[in-house]
From Swiss-Prot:
It comes from Mycobacterium tuberculosis (strain ATCC 25177 / H37Ra). Its main location: cytoplasm. It is found in: Cytoplasm. Keywords: Chaperone, Cytoplasm, Nickel insertion. This is Urease accessory protein UreF.
Amino acid sequence: MTSLAVLLTLADSRLPTGAHVHSGGIEEAIAAGMVTGLATLEAFLKRRVRTHGLLTASIAAAVHRGELAVDDADRETDARTPAPAARHASRSQGRGLIRLARRVWPDSGWEELGPRPHLAVVAGRVGALSGLAPEHNALHLVYITMTGSAIAAQRLLALDPAEVTVVTFQLSELCEQIAQEATAGLADLSDPLLDTLAQRHDERVRPLFVS
């Protein structure tokens, strides 16, 4: 499989990792009246890409290049993810990705990552094994950070899929910029708003999405 095909496969929303059950905070943002339509959705996606997307991609890129050991990457992710609910969501998605990765690349030392690794840590290892360039691996993570929330908003607000897709096209350049920034070094930031949304969502009774 070529690196381009790997990139497209990892970015495919149909990838069976369980990511489709996570909204990235958009469900709670909609419930709070923060996201009501396309304009506010775009603003939310920009913020999420610039914070969570950058953070996840930067840790994955460091693991990918071998600059950050698995245990260190796990601690760095925890330190930048204050909300327990957000950490749980990250580890849940990491577990989904590692389950698939074990089947694609067996006998690749997955035990080292433990039973519930963060998504960024698994993605870094997957990127290295698949032959992707670190910047492409970072781009795929930034991209799915955006599209996961965009698709969830489309469903929750009954938005026109074409109009939501236009928004994601308009943010494509931003995604590339953030991916480049992520490969330059570890991002040292968190987003109190996204952490608050994650924690509130975790306390919600019968939400439609896991996070």
